[in-house]
């Protein structure tokens, strides 16, 4: 803990890499009581066991599909995080030169007040639709229609007139989430990717803390492996990994690494 505090104090730059474990620590849990509270009807009718697997359920109609998804998006994107982990994290980097790269799609960084120009969320956003085709590299804000779907759904179906369609080609809209090669990387996505690359390039060789939070091995090529490589390349860099159950680093950077097998929220609250 002391080493982490010292690293935060001494560094000129903080690059945060955030995975699903960070949002879990903030209370966005997809199982158990939270699932029961919001999806007991779906669990009963369809045998769905948790929110995540429900997202893959082959519903017979689009009205049922969107009844499930609108509720899912509403509670995981438009409701506030149950615990203040993201707020604590913002306090931690306040006044620092920082950038955030995240595979999370729940918008928690923006909601906590992180600078949007210092954020790159690589895998999409629960708050955006895209064309299912896709006929265009464009995304569409979904808040208004999601709130309507949640409000007007009955018997686990949304009214047909609320089904979202592409304004350009009329095909159904779908979530802007990376699951296959149809994922739309819109102008905003490319601008964020460019800002992240620029940030790293212009801070090469500086005292950088690569702070990895709640990142597992689902997509290690996005955050984990690059953080290891950049730490190995820069003798002034420190790699810190906080993750329940999986906090490791390669031997080459062991001397300049802080690996904490612990609850991310707890450690962040201690570090503030």
Predicted regions and their residues:
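Conserved catalytic alpha/beta core of Sir2/sirtuin-type deacylases, generalized to analogous enzyme cores
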Residues: 1-272
């Amino acid at each position: 803990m002391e080493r982490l505090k010292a690293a935060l104090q001494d560094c000129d730059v903080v690059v945060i890499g955030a995975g699903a474990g960070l949002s879990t620590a903030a209370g966005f849990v997809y199982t158990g009581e939270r699932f029961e509270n919001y999806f007991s009807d779906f669990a009963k009718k369809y045998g769905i066991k948790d929110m995540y697997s429900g997202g893959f359920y082959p519903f017979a109609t689009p009205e049922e599909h969107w009844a499930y998804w609108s509720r899912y998006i509403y509670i995981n994107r438009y409701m506030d995080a149950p615990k203040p982990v993201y707020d604590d994290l913002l306090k931690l980097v306040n006044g620092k030169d920082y950038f955030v790269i995240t595979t999370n799609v729940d918008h928690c960084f923006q909601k906590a007040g992180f600078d949007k120009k210092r954020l790159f969320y690589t895998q999409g956003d629960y708050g955006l639709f895209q064309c299912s085709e896709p006929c265009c590299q464009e995304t569409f804000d979904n808040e208004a229609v999601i709130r309507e779907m949640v409000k007007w759904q009955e018997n686990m179906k949304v009214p047909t007139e609320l089904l979202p369609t592409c304004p350009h080609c009329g095909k159904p809209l779908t979530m802007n989430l990376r699951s296959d090669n149809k994922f739309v990387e819109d102008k905003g996505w490319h601008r964020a990717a460019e800002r992240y690359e620029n940030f790293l390039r212009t801070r090469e060789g500086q005292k950088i803390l690569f702070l990895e939070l709640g990142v597992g091995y689902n997509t290690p090529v996005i955050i984990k492996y690059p953080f290891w490589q950049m730490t190995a390349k820069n003798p002034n860099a420190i790699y810190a990994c906080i993750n329940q159950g999986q906090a490791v680093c390669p031997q080459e950077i062991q001397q300049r690494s802080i690996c904490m097998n612990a609850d991310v929220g707890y450690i962040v609250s201690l570090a503030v």
